[in-house]
Amino acid sequence: MSKWKDVKKVVLAYSGGLDTSIILKWLQTELGAEVVTFTADLGQGEELEPARKKAEMLGIKEIFIEDVREEFVRDFVFPMFRANAVYEGVYLLGTSIARPLISKHLIEIARKTGADAIAHGATGKGNDQVRFELSAYALNPDIKIIAPWRDWSFKSRTHLLEFAEQHQIPVAKDKKGEAPFSVDANLLHSSSEGKVLEDPAVEAPEYVHMRTISPETAPDKATIIKIGFEKGDAVSINGERLSPATLLAKLNDYGRDNGIGRLDLVENRFVGMKSRGVYETPGGTILLAAHRAIESITLDRGAAHLKDELMPRYAELIYYGFWFSPEREMLQAAIDHSQRHVEGEVTLKLYKGNVMVIGRESDKSLYSDKLVTFEDDQGAYDQKDAAGFIKLNALRLRTLAARDRK
């Protein structure tokens, strides 16, 4: 293609799946470019050696497969959870938060290998194209970015399957003998889109769910766990200190076994359309409940309420792909400052899809039983003081009422 005629070497974000395997072959045949592959181990729960073998089969000489699980949770997931970030009230941003990390490594590998372009498999209809490219440009303003879904003649996955068959590219099959749902997975979540899920009125079949058992079949006995926090980050489960990735993986196990973290969502994409997806975020759902609980006793009311006001904007920045933007970094600095005293332990009950906070404690707690007791508080609080407080706060309301009754 003439627009890419100067591109000699491309780093491809490669999963080994249908789209990126076809993109790899397309880059070779249509652009005549040398391709370098990068496969990130984000904790997606699948063996990555098949991706290496597939790349080798397609003639790739430089293959990068990197375990980025700890970096992912430590530098991306945990900072996001300090903000209690959810998009449109429910989505825990599992796909969104992984994209800037992938872009970061694509840019680094391009620099190491002397590549003049990077490529990704995101479609021209979705959010991921924006997330990958905004992140890449923020890190290297001169990088060339190839997005084949916006350039090639294929208009559907049916056409992709035909191309794959022509070039003898193996394609995985699901239980029905068809090409699988469009799936994204990492240590934080998994998502499924496409096929019957494109009709928002139709319930997702059970086999779509990869990370959790159904709440109906979850154990009849509740699971009790304790999560320890330091400076807003989870550091332990049941008293055992764990690395960030190990801790999230363990929470995923607890969530999976108790049917926690399923979400059937129609969301507003950045590009303007609505889309339906089925998400599973077992460990993240538990972590969010625990983090909000420890904040409830360690954050001042004003700071907590301001943080809640800022959260939707922060979540939107991540969803839209602005992780490396100055405004996200500014908000992160404020959020991180708020977490200095967010430490302690939260006890949770996990039962049939539910996460229930049943206890929270901290040496930095602002909760005072002397102030809130219904018994004798030994002079800790003078209830007579409330009269003046109410009178001053009612002043403007009484003034308005006096005017309006005339």
Curated annotation (Swiss-Prot):
Signal peptide: none
Enzyme Commission number(s) from the entry: 6.3.4.5
Keyword terms, alphabetized: Amino-acid biosynthesis, Arginine biosynthesis, ATP-binding, Cytoplasm, Ligase, Nucleotide-binding
GO BP terms, alphabetized: argininosuccinate metabolic process; L-arginine biosynthetic process; urea cycle
Location(s), subcellular: Cytoplasm
Gene Ontology CC terms, in alphabetical order: cytoplasm
Complex formation: Homotetramer.
Designated name of the protein: Argininosuccinate synthase
Organism lineage string: Bacteria, Pseudomonadati, Pseudomonadota, Alphaproteobacteria, Hyphomicrobiales
